[in-house]
Amino acid sequence: MKVLVINCGSSSLKYQLLDMETEKVLCKGLCERIGGEGSCITHQVGGNKMKADAPFPSHTEAFAKLVEMMTEGEGKVIDSINEIDAIGHRCVHGGEKFQKSCLVTDEVIKTIDELSPLAPLHNPACLLGLKASREVFGMDKPNVVVFDTAFHSTMPPKAYMYPLPYEYYQEYGVRRYGFLGTSHKYVSLKAAEYMGQHPKDLKIITCHLGNGSSIAAVKRGQVVDTSMGMTPLAGLMMGTRCGDIDPSVVNYLKYSLGITGHELDEILNKKSGLAGVSGVPSGDKRDIEAAASAGDKRAQLAQDMLNYQIKKYIGSYAVAMGGVDCLVFTGGIGEHDAQLREAVCEGLDFLGIRINVDKNQNCHGDVCDITGWRGDVCVLVIATDEELMIARETKQVVEE
């Protein structure tokens, strides 16, 4: 079976074609600036990368172009569109309606649209991809939608409810949903596989740390709590997002600064977090680390705050699960920032978390075990693969 994995933005389309017999990536690429000037496609087969300018008035033309790149010329990996057995789409928000991946129908599209107020930037983009895919591939080709929120749907009410008037949950769906679930699921399963144990026998804390960051408590294969909330703004401080703050700060700033709700939303989402504290506009952890090394005290403070917050979540989730067997670091920062991993794990001996400093500094491969001597908790650095997880889910849904 060959599965095409799609991740749509409002003006972009990221894709990957996988042969599920071997789980090998046949090709991958990115269509950019859809609906605007200078639209183009970058198509990669192995180490060979091709770029072509092409007009993409909509996602439909982008789909048609990626099919052309796959079936013709230098980037050809299949003979025809018929070799693609199914298309798997990433969707950020499934709300309470979608607790697992499902086949796309008119009713599913309608429901995803109804959930758009919960993810106004992401769900409409997913819908553009779903509709364009059906246009290009035809209505008979199976399309499967995989939700970022689905893996977190096992959280109990005591973890997902907010202490607000209950009718706000009933009428408006105000509750914790959690995000980046596809990554959390992939690395938790990978960790269990590495440890040679069934997921149902383990208590795992997964730390997906990147420009967007999320931590999850996975007990016996099910999420019991996670750091992100009703939106991906909650939880840890991130590259440019504030994470958890006192809710009263929002109104205080709105009136003190004399700004609109939209302007405040921009500050909380795009000018806060590591960027806001450090003064490094990019919010990129590498830039902040460099600034801290050069003696920038605000950059150092931003790093200290992030490390401290991650520690707190690890401690609280260990308590929530009654212990921890495995701690996983993943995501752009989690996989590549040895300094952060060491700082986070320092002082967690009482939980049985100890790392080998040399292994931590020389971390390579899909799974890197950095557990230290006499460490009771397996500490792993795992390269996440959300596309592969979406492809697996798609294959499973189609075969069912």
Question: Where are these predicted regions, by residue range?
Answer:
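Short glycine-rich, Thr/Ser-proximal phosphate-binding strand/loop in the N-terminal lobe
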Residues: 3, 12-57, 229
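Short beta-strand-loop/turn "lid" adjacent to the catalytic site in phosphate-handling enzymes
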Residues: 70, 76-122, 142-144, 150-159
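General beta-strand structural signal in soluble alpha/beta enzymes
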Residues: 89, 121-124, 142-147, 205-207, ...
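Glycine-rich phosphate-binding loop of actin/hexokinase-like ATP-binding domains
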Residues: 151-255
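Phosphate/ATP-binding catalytic cores across multiple sugar-kinase/actin-like superfamilies
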Residues: 187-190, 194, 301-322
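A mobile "lid/hinge" subdomain adjacent to the ATP/sugar-phosphate binding pocket shared
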Residues: 257-302
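Glycine-rich phosphate-binding loops at beta-strand->alpha-helix junctions
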Residues: 325-347
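Structural signal for terminal/edge beta-strands and the immediately following C-terminal loop/tail
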Residues: 366-400
